[in-house]
């Protein structure tokens, strides 16, 4: 997706109010599978088969993304992908995601709508449900995602289990996102593949669990 500037003539999030904004983000979300109670109450409730694995990830505008490099849809997808990848690296199955968004009150509602669409798209790709979150105002856009994952009766596969002489296996592409940052930083938009790797990373969902079930002694998200 090619980023475009926000439509500053559109309504701003400060004009629609927090509850209306939350309604736009969560419209149509329900509860299924391990999620017994999703958005709309003080807490979400999940039923798990094993131990709970939890990880959180924060993205700050100007540090982890730039709006002239990434569209709102891209930012939403990246927020989910970066967080869920950590659960995958423990051999856990992601089941729930809590997401908080802080943004300037002057930001167009259109940006939040596109961001939410990206979050939903990546949640669907990852097989995880958005179960809650928070919104507030801030000078810059800050997105924090927390993933809740089920180990399903298996022990967590930590970084500490690696031993000399073991086989090292890699799933996914190494260095492409960093190459994308370097390309964009020089004012270019191609090679497109590495630019997209920065804007919208695509973790190999399911590979972490498969590795854990196959007996991997160590896992890490890099």
Model-inferred region functions:
Residues 1-222:
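Helix-biased detector of long, well-ordered alpha-helical tracts
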């Amino acid at each position: 997706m090619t980023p475009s500037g926000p439509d500053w003539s559109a309504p701003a999030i400060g004009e629609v109010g927090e509850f209306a904004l939350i309604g736009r983000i969560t419209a149509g979300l329900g509860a299924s599978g391990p999620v017994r109670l999703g958005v709309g109450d003080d807490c979400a409730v999940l039923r798990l088969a094993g131990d709970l694995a939890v990880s959180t990830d924060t993205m700050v505008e100007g540090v982890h993304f730039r709006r002239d490099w990434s569209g709102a849809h891209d930012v939403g997808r990246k927020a989910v992908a970066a967080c869920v990848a950590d659960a995958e690296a423990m051999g856990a199955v992601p089941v729930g995601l809590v997401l908080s968004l802080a943004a300037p009150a002057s930001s167009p509602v259109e940006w939040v709508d596109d961001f939410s669409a990206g979050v939903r798209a990546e949640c669907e790709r990852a097989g995880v449900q958005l179960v809650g979150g928070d919104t507030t105002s801030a000078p810059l856009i800050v997105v924090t995602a927390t993933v809740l994952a089920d180990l399903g009766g298996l022990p967590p596969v930590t970084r500490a289990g690696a031993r000399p002489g073991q086989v090292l296996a890699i799933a996914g592409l190494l260095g492409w996102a960093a190459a994308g940052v370097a390309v964009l930083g020089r004012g270019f938009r191609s090679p497109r593949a590495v630019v997209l790797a920065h804007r919208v990373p695509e973790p190999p969902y399911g590979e972490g669990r498969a590795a854990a079930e196959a007996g991997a002694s160590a896992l890490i998200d890099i």
